[in-house]
Amino acid sequence: MKIKAGFIVREVAGTFLAIATGELSKTYHGSLTLNSSAKFLFDNMQEDTTKEELVKKLVEYYDDLDEATALSAVEDFVNKLEEANLLD
């Protein structure tokens, strides 16, 4: 799974916004507000990956994060992207 192409990400007042552009903006009219962990996942989903790979990367990136919490975060983020039809 990976995020559909066509987003640009900008930092605004300490928050990251992923804004749909080009062809994607014809079907997705919103933007995604990303905290630091969501931005990390978003960046790592530009290429095809799995939930398991994302959990592993998240645990490696955040020293104090346990696998169960990382899995919950990944599943929540992926579910939101699926609901918005933003995954390839």
Give each language-model segment a name.
Residues 30-88:
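Long, charge-rich, low-complexity alpha-helical segments
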Residues 1-46:
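Acidic, low-complexity/disordered tracts enriched in E/D and polar residues
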